[in-house]
Design a protein with these regions (language model features):
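C-terminal non-catalytic accessory extensions
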Residues: 542-587
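Axial heme c-ligation environment in periplasmic c-type cytochrome domains
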Residues: 73-77, 102-126, 136-137, 496-523, ...
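C-terminal motif of bacterial Sec signal peptides marking the signal peptidase cleavage site
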Residues: 15-17
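Domain-exit/linker segments immediately C-terminal to small folded modules
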Residues: 142-152, 448-542
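Periplasmic/extracellular electron-transfer cofactor-ligation site
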Residues: 56-79, 130-141, 435-453
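Solvent-exposed helix-loop boundary motif
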Residues: 20-30, 35, 39, 44-123, ...
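Bacterial N-terminal signal peptides that target proteins for export
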Residues: 1-10
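Extended surface/linker regions that mediate inter-domain or inter-protein docking
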Residues: 170-441, 447, 453, 571, ...
């Protein structure tokens, strides 16, 4: 994806790709969008130049005292550098209503001191964002779910893949070699997928590896072949151990212990039998439980996780009620993009780092049709002593990206969100909220902005005691405090994502979700042969002895059918040792 800032006469480096825009809002005012503005034509360029000058002037006059010349309130500095606002996600090109800068001034939350922007000034700012900043989709940015479009691709035989890996690993010193593993996209090239689609998988792999990292560093996998289909990783770069890798390969239905001299050399150097896995399977499997939880070492309960993070939520809330230091802040609202009912989100500062936060949501089941929520489920009636039905946890990893955990009403870890409590309305192909996968997609731009509705509601109500009013005021932070902390956490995530170099969108979808949905698609003969690492002729020759593939020469089979029978069929094709042919080494 290429990015043009019209009138700015500047082009972002390709490494950044599409910058991470401002998060969508979570809460009551989240549903609007400015629409598809399209690209300015030549007649508009002069107007854009004038609007750019006017926007710079009005931001200088109204905002620079807090957000420029070294002042960086709310993690926002250089307010008059319009390219910076776009690059760092404070302005979403072509969409004012999803841009932090516009939303803050349009809602009158900013500027904190001084007169709010007038209608004409708001129109100027909105028009500049909607019309004069454009994200231009690259024609090569293709959906991963599209059928392969490059039938001329020549598959890389398995023996050549092994030779490439062997030539790479023998150059490493012994310690590095033992921590080295490989992920392959070669079968996608062999199946006829074009470079643009394979590039999408590269972005998904890069993003996911760092979303699964226990290390403070961002690390991209290293391509070892000219076609960039074979990738090397070092376990230590992600804070993983050999046990972590074993948990991955133990889950792999495509695991094959390859034979031959090259494979033997690799196994000896890496000190492991299963040194290579298919990258698209890894993206699919490791982005969701149980493997997601295993790799990130997320324990069985919310309370154990908080202990690992050095966090005492109960004590923090008690301290906040006593001292009001904004170490804990909440926002409650009626409508959410994920929850069927009202919702509360709560932020804690992680003690290990000023840049890492722990967010906890309190979610509630929808009231039965024709009935009202019970008082202890209605956060406007019970903002302090509610009884939640479940929740989502988001916390910053050491590298600044996010990790996720779904819990039930008792704080026990669950793999999917209860459908009566939460759903993923932004991904109709996968409406069930799957921990990890759905969360990465929903929070692809960091925290979703929330606006509290509780404090104002309670302040106008005679139904609360003086102490309850004070407690609500201390927990449900003022808008400027809550916004500042949200923007701080957004900046932490955005900076980490930029460091990965991964695009925020592939074929119009978040990369990991796009790869997951594509992986679930049907398997044809060419794809099957490529995944086995053999020719289509080799598959057809053995077809009568294979399971689940009897019609693959005429029609596709489902991914589930192909996967369930892979280990057996790999034995029939004699490509190596699987769980179903342990004696193949002697053949």
């Amino acid at each position: 994806m290429s990015i043009r800032h019209l009138c700015a006469l500047s082009i972002l480096p390709l490494l950044i790709g599409c910058q991470l825009p401002t998060p969508p809002q979570d809460g009551a005012a989240a549903d609007s969008a400015s629409g598809d503005a399209g690209e300015p034509d030549d007649a508009q360029l002069g107007e854009c130049a004038e609007q750019r000058t006017e926007v710079e002037r009005l931001l200088t006059d109204h905002c620079a005292s807090c957000h420029d010349n070294g002042n960086t309130r709310g993690a926002l500095g250089r307010i008059t550098d319009l390219d910076h606002l776009i690059d760092d996600g404070f302005v979403v090109p072509g969409n004012a209503l999803e841009s932090i800068v516009y939303k803050q001034v349009e809602s009158k939350k900013m500027p904190v001191a001084g007169e709010p922007l007038g209608d004409a000034q708001l129109t100027t700012l909105r028009d500049w964002i909607d019309v004069c900043t454009v994200v231009e989709a690259d024609s090569e940015d293709r959906s991963l779910a599209e059928a392969p479009g490059c039938p001329e691709n020549v598959a890389l035989p398995q023996r050549d893949q092994l030779a490439a890996i062997r030539d790479d690993i023998v150059l490493l010193d012994n310690a590095d070699a033992r921590a080295t593993r490989y992920l392959s996209l070669a079968h996608l090239y062999g199946a006829g997928y074009c470079e643009a689609q394979i590039e999408g998988y590269r972005h998904a792999l890069n993003k996911l590896l760092n979303h699964l990292s226990l290390s403070p560093n961002i690390r991209a996998p290293l391509a070892i072949d000219e076609a960039r289909t074979l990738y090397r990783i070092n376990l230590f770069d992600y804070g993983w151990t050999t046990a972590t890798w074993k948990s991955i390969t133990d889950s792999d239905p495509y695991a094959v212990v390859f034979q031959g001299d090259d494979a033997l050399d690799i196994r000896e150097a890496a000190d492991v039998d299963l040194f290579s896995i298919k990258a698209d399977w890894f993206i699919d499997a490791a982005s969701q439980p149980p493997l997601y939880y295993t790799i990130l070492e997320i324990p069985g309960t919310r309370f154990e996780l908080e202990g690992q993070l050095g966090l005492d939520v109960t004590a923090n809330i008690s301290d906040e009620l006593s001292f009001d230091r904004d170490f804990v802040v909440r926002a409650g609202f009626q409508k959410s993009k994920v929850s069927f009912s009202n919702r509360i989100v709560e932020r804690h500062q992680l003690p290990s780092s000023p840049d890492r936060a722990y967010w906890l949501s309190y979610d509630f089941a929808e009231a039965p049709k024709g009935k009202s929520l019970p008082s202890d489920k209605n956060i406007f009636e019970s903002p302090l002593d509610f009884v939640q039905d479940g929740g989502e946890i988001i916390f910053n990893l050491a590298n600044g990206l996010q990790a996720y955990m779904l819990v039930d009403k008792d704080g026990k870890r669950i793999e999917t969100g209860p459908p009566e409590v939460v759903h993923d309305q932004e991904t109709p192909e996968e409406p069930v909220v799957i921990n990890g996968l759905s969360c990465m997609s929903c929070h692809s731009e960091g925290m979703r902005l929330a606006t509290d509705e509780i404090a104002a509601s309670v302040a106008d109500s005679p139904d609360f005691t003086t102490q309850e009013l004070q407690d609500v005021a201390r927990l449900y932070a003022p808008a400027d405090v809550f916004n500042r902390l949200q923007q701080q956490d957004i900046a932490t995530f955005v900076d980490a994502m930029k460091a990965t170099g991964a695009l925020r969108s592939v074929g119009g979808q978040e990369p990991v979700m796009a790869a997951h949905l594509a992986f679930a698609g049907p398997v044809d003969l060419r794809r099957a042969a490529a995944e086995f690492g053999v020719t289509t002729e080799a598959v057809l020759t053995k077809l009568s002895a294979m399971q689940g593939l009897s019609t693959i020469n005429r029609v596709t089979v489902t991914r589930d059918t192909f996967q369930q029978n892979f280990a057996f069929n790999a034995c029939i094709l004699n490509i190596g040792i699987t769980a179903l042919c342990p004696d193949v080494a002697g053949q």
